[in-house]
């Protein structure tokens, strides 16, 4: 992905991908979102940094500010800020054959959902959580599960670009049929 964005570094003025490349090269930066369509008025660019811990530290933000300051146009107002973390509770009911042992099943399902919500495993969809993703992850990781019903969140969750969904309380109910 960085290779594809490298063409932007040849441009005479910094583009969205130029800012992404510069910030992504800084240790500790996991994901960069650039709002370059004048989010605060003409000549403004907002850069949202997601660190490996979710929220970027002030030290990491300062490193990104310095890097962006070196490449920005004189008439561009660049604002570097951290992504906002939103804890999302997840409650699922899994159905398994009553002939199978249910020992440790709830813990395996909980570990599967926790793994789904790890930042490193999610690509660039850090602000989305869909029922389909939850169901697919559980059924892929725990082969004995016949059915998965997601009760929380009640619907797919899509937040603003500057927000990142992380795991809140994970509740698993196991039913035998």
Predicted segments, located by residue:
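Single conserved position on a long alpha-helix in the C-terminal lobe of the eukaryotic protein kinase
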Residues: 1-3
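Carbohydrate-recognition loop of C-type lectin domains
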Residues: 8-127
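An aromatic-glycine-centered, glycine-rich loop/turn in mixed alpha/beta architecture
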Residues: 108-177
